[in-house]
Amino acid sequence: MNTRDTLKINGKGHLEIGGADCVDLAEKFGTPLYVMDEAYIRNMCRVYRDAIEKYYDGNGLVLYASKAFSCLAVYKIVKQEKIGIDVVSGGELFTALKAGFPADKIYMHGNNKLVSELEYALQNDVGTIVVDSYSELDTLDTLSEKYGKRQSILIRVNPGVEAHTHHFIQTAKTDSKFGFSLSDGTAEKITEYAIRKKHLKLKGYHCHIGSQIFEKQSFILAADKMMAFIREMKDKFAFEADTLNLGGGYGIWYTDEDAKISCDGYAEYLQALIAEIAAKAKAYDVKKPFLLIEPGRSIVGEAGITLYTVGAIKDIPGVKKYVAVDGGMFDNPRYALYQAKYTAVAANRANEKPTEIVTIAGKCCESGDIVCANVNLPAVKTGDVLAILSTGAYNYSMASNYNRNLIPPVVLVKDGTAEYIVKPQTFEDLIRNDVVPERLQ
């Protein structure tokens, strides 16, 4: 088990996170329960922030990719750590503004931003909008004129770098729905078009090659391609980008199949990337751009676990043993989407050695409702508390009320003390927005 300094086994043989006993958490708050370690989140913010300060003389900004985990308390933590935020919807923007983020540190993404979302961004002086289509560029130019602004923008570019990860989270393939391709010339054409817009100020480019990537070389290759493109645009249009956003995608540990990247390791990723940017700036005779990076999963992923209570156990002789829990795809759809792998721990018997391989199933009425497949556990019993590790990213943020199940609450742990940061839902919440027409009364 990769503890990453947030998890340990205490004298009772129970799993702890951030100094809090997971069995006690399950008893106090119930299950399913998302648990987040505040210290881990803060530390990862500092790792990235300090690396830019150390290796790039502070000529950049870390943006938390908030789609990984979105709630007011986490946004507040990120803001307090003096990094920026990227948002991909009106709802995420609303949350960032409510959390008090300075508008100039908010970057807005999305391949199909609604007109209402663009207007909302302009009305609230959002610092930079990342443009992903001609229609968006035209709409934003018109809206900027309407609001008397000259909006700063980046253009999302697809550098054509193949990242070795699940194909659903590769975002820089030639056929991706995101960005303008370098290979077919569309990135060049949109640049020429954008610099003629009177009410938009093109600051530079954004790219993002995918998620859960461990190969340093993939990021370096993307940086190389982007710096070469910056030089091309300088030569062709006398436009020299002053901002380069290289996105995020740094991998985290889910199982022992994954690399265990230390905090220093993440800093070394940035050090290598920054060295390449500096070298290419010199080689191509362009200025070193203001650098933006967008870590999300690596800030919150390993900070979180999910606690479940074991219910029914079904052993199909010679085939498979199912251990059913009180959660499932409504609180973690990643297995259904990506066949995601996780590590499971019997939180109330954490010092016991695994004795069997089981599949942890959810309670939804779906055959594909699996939390994690083929995991090693001791012989668990009904009532045991299971912890699924590294669930801080893309679990709560992707949760739903499927089968009219309640989305679990979230508690934040600091120095052994846990507090709600997302309250439990109630059955009343499920029907709060339901409307029954008069004819059906």
List PLM regions with ranges.
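A charged N-terminal "starter" segment
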Residues: 1-129, 134-152, 188, 192-201, ...
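Short beta-strand segments
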Residues: 65, 152-158, 206-208, 245-247, ...
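Solvent-exposed alpha-helices and their adjacent loops that cap or buttress functional pockets
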Residues: 98-101, 122-123, 145-148, 170-172, ...
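Active-site-proximal loop/turn and secondary-structure-junction residues that shape catalytic pockets
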Residues: 68-70, 91, 112-114, 133-135, ...
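Charged (often Lys/Glu-rich) extended helix/loop segments that serve as interaction or gating elements
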Residues: 286-441
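Conserved active-site and cofactor/substrate-binding residues in soluble primary-metabolism enzymes
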Residues: 20, 36-43, 69, 135, ...
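Activation segment
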Residues: 26, 254, 333-334
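Active-site loop/helix belt of alpha/beta enzymes
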Residues: 160-312, 403, 414
